[in-house]
Amino acid sequence: MMDLPTIISWVGTVIGIILNLSPAVLFYNIHLGKEKYTNIPETMLIFNILCSSLWACYWYLQEDKFVPFFSAMAGLGLSEIFSLLYLYYFSGKCLKKYLLFALLEINLVIEFNYVLIRIIGDYSMVGNIAVVVNILTYIAPGQNIIKVCKEKNYRLIPIASTLSGASCALSWLLFGILIKDIHTIIPNSLGLIFAAINSFTWAYFYCNRDKNDDEENGQKELITPEKEEI
């Protein structure tokens, strides 16, 4: 029978995998031509790859930490897949250029993990680096909150992703508390705080929104231009 930390870590793993699948919608829209390529999602994916690599090595260097290791590896695998898909569009769908970029990225990921495990080899040191990099990933959400406050537009906050992220952070925070792992507690505490700030900001501007603007936007979405007969 599984103990409580293991159950909670599996919950966090499932939520984390769902969150890591979220770029699929963006890539589908890019494939259909509904959205254009930008560097921002690729930058976020690179940060995710870096973070996942660090956490995977952190848990690998410890004993009996299969579930968090599996969670980190799942995040690394999904982020790598989406990143490689993004490189395909970045290379202008040129196969030779794409293969060059793809092999370079995969090689860098392998070498980075090799350095963490074989050269550093100390899980505490790897954990310290992981915490710092994890904290840096909150810069983008922080800038988005500032933008929301300036424009007073609650739609800029993806509330579904925010709540899912909060659930994931809460799961791993509880896991970290139960196993008394400070490297897990710090980033997930900050993640939960950022998610709470995002949620309160969204709720505030949603409750104080201009309902007339909402009605106009809704009407614009319903109105579709008629096709001209040829």
Language model regions located:
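Alpha-helical membrane-protein topology signature
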Residues: 1-230
